[in-house]
Curated annotation (Swiss-Prot):
<feature type="binding site">
    <location>
        <position position="100"/>
    </location>
    <ligand>
        <name>substrate</name>
    </ligand>
</feature>
<keyword id="KW-0520">NAD</keyword>
<keyword id="KW-0464">Manganese</keyword>
<comment type="subunit">
    <text>Homodimer.</text>
</comment>
<comment type="similarity">
    <text>Belongs to the isocitrate and isopropylmalate dehydrogenases family.</text>
</comment>
<dbReference type="InterPro" id="IPR019818">
    <property type="entry name" value="IsoCit/isopropylmalate_DH_CS"/>
</dbReference>
<dbReference type="GO" id="GO:0003862">
    <property type="term" value="F:3-isopropylmalate dehydrogenase activity"/>
</dbReference>
<dbReference type="InterPro" id="IPR024084">
    <property type="entry name" value="IsoPropMal-DH-like_dom"/>
</dbReference>
<feature type="binding site">
    <location>
        <begin position="82"/>
        <end position="93"/>
    </location>
    <ligand>
        <name>NAD(+)</name>
    </ligand>
</feature>
<comment type="function">
    <text>Catalyzes the oxidation of 3-carboxy-2-hydroxy-4-methylpentanoate (3-isopropylmalate) to 3-carboxy-4-methyl-2-oxopentanoate. The product decarboxylates to 4-methyl-2 oxopentanoate.</text>
</comment>
<comment type="pathway">
    <text>Amino-acid biosynthesis; L-leucine biosynthesis; L-leucine from 3-methyl-2-oxobutanoate: step 3/4.</text>
</comment>
<feature type="site" description="Important for catalysis">
    <location>
        <position position="146"/>
    </location>
</feature>
<keyword id="KW-0028">Amino-acid biosynthesis</keyword>
<feature type="binding site">
    <location>
        <position position="139"/>
    </location>
    <ligand>
        <name>substrate</name>
    </ligand>
</feature>
<dbReference type="GO" id="GO:0009098">
    <property type="term" value="P:L-leucine biosynthetic process"/>
</dbReference>
<feature type="binding site">
    <location>
        <position position="110"/>
    </location>
    <ligand>
        <name>substrate</name>
    </ligand>
</feature>
<dbReference type="InterPro" id="IPR004429">
    <property type="entry name" value="Isopropylmalate_DH"/>
</dbReference>
Amino acid sequence: MSVKTKTITILPGDHVGTEIVNEAIKVLEAIEAATPYQKIHFDFKHHLIGGAAIDATGVPLPDDALESAKNSDAVLLGAVGGPKWGTGALRPEQGLLKIRKELNLYANIRPCNFASDSLLELSPLRPEVVKGTNLIIVRELVGGIYFGDREEQEESADKQTAWDTEKYTVDEVTRITRMAAFMALQHTPPLPIWSLDKANVLASSRLWRRTVDKVISEEFPTLSVQHQLIDSAAMILIQNPTKLNGIIITSNMFGDIISDEASVIPGSLGLLPSASLASLPDTNTAFGLYEPCHGSAPDLPANKVNPIATILSAASMLRLSLDCVKEAEALEEAVKQVLDKGIRTADLRGTSSTTEVGDAIVEAVTKILKEKA
């Protein structure tokens, strides 16, 4: 059996980014050594992004990092940002926005579920309210107001005006709808689709709604889609989150907000992975960028950050970009086993360190894979 090499660009970023990415690499190396399903080698290419890149090169995304990403099978990112770099002309977050745009990462996939039912008690909502929550937010990532025209005008100190433009095309909405439909069809029976917009006041949302309806009815007639105003959906997500189980599709800004709201339901940002894709993962080889939902946590002491979100992001990378579906399933099972054993960082009311959690997951996934041999 020939060895299959997969190239992964590693962008640790700032603060805890290095720690969490190191744990994910450790787990991936264990999978490489133990998997009985195929001979595989992960070739890691390390580069800078964010504040670390600004300090070293003067820009938040150096050309060599972008070029490496373009020539890789996937990108694994830690986290960017921190108070050191403030909100000036050069900001760490600009590196993330640029790489999304340059790599055409148009779809952000964020699940909201419980990696283990033993975590239900950690949710800020009552366990009986959140039990069974299982939704996937598909956010359009390279269009809308974040990439529209904008301007700040100052005629005088007392007279200032600023505006941002929300703009969507039929093509942009069509491709994100197809992504949501593909995700829905990966389940038996297919998952329902919820489309969130503000069609009662925004022209862009009315185009969004019309396009979603057209794509689903013409291309995916077996799927169901329901429309919900974003403000109403935000309330439902807290009152009765399981009502929104399935696939949620929404625009860039609305997706940014609703996915952050959803991320607190499981009790910790340290649990939730994120994938940003440039194409449908219909052959499990879509190019993607994978990162945790949380930020760089500059105030957190060393070896205290929860690495699970990044490790689960690596599991998503295995499944969607690296054609290692069985390895991804083994890794997700390993995470569940470790959580059920109570090996947890402080954000999950545990006492384990970052490296201890990573080591436990390495041990668990190695055992699972060797049992399959």
